[in-house]
Amino acid sequence: DHYLSLDLNVTSIEASEPILKEMQRRGVNLSFLVYDVLPLMHPEWWPAGLADGFASWFAVVTRVADRLICISRAVRDDVAVQLELNAVNTTGTPKLGWFHLGADIKNTSPSVHLPRDADDFFGRIVNQTTFLMVGTVEPRKGHALALDAFSQLWRNGYDFNLVVIGKKGWLVDDLADRMSACSKNRSQFYWFQGASDEFLERAYLSCSCLLAASEAEGFGLPLIEASFHKLPVLARDIAVFREVAGDAALYFDGSSSEGLVAGVLRWVRQKELNAIPEPAGMDTMSWQESANALLDQLEI
């Protein structure tokens, strides 16, 4: 028999440990999905207590798991490092594996709602150079870096648009205030919170390029969504984005805002030369293909 834990369960994992060990004693193979280990790597990115709770979860699952199955090769590598750093006392090191998540965007049931001025907005930006960021505004997502870089571009006379779709998250009060002020005072910056799937779909179809600026991710679903919509990608040069997008994206040095400025200008130059990478070249999977890959990892 196989037991597969598909989601993070911080609140009850310690109480469940005796049950899991008894299941294992009776011959059940225990596997846990790992989406990332970022709270262990960067506790400063999370609200108080979350990193400690995650550390407790990680300690238990590495004590009892036969397998830890990660959602990318990059996460698997991170887990391997954390197993060494935390020197977990287990009866045997869990077997590590990885697979990729799927995406069947056309077969989802999207939320439908457009603001009254949506047609005017998209009709305007579709003819302008517009970069799109998708995801909750939180410390690791790179919104501060993007705002710094685009502010520099605007000061230097470039009129590129930056569109952010994503609600305010945690530990970003000052950044959110800055973004709100910028959206009111700068005609090239737009921040939409609570946007519907229909609005996001229009954004993917109307913008010029997806800007993926995160410092770290477990996978990077917006890159896959961009590929489905044939939207070019400019991504921070991190391992998981290289893994997901390969040669189907341009990459920038995210160590400073100047690196992003250089990346944006390089992307624009290559766009003018019709030399940007083709986003449809990403290796994407359906959810059925992803499920089959997961079953392969379980060796069922």
Regions inferred by a protein language model and the residue ranges of each:
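Carbohydrate transferase catalytic cores enriched for Leloir-type hexosyltransferases
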Residues: 1-300
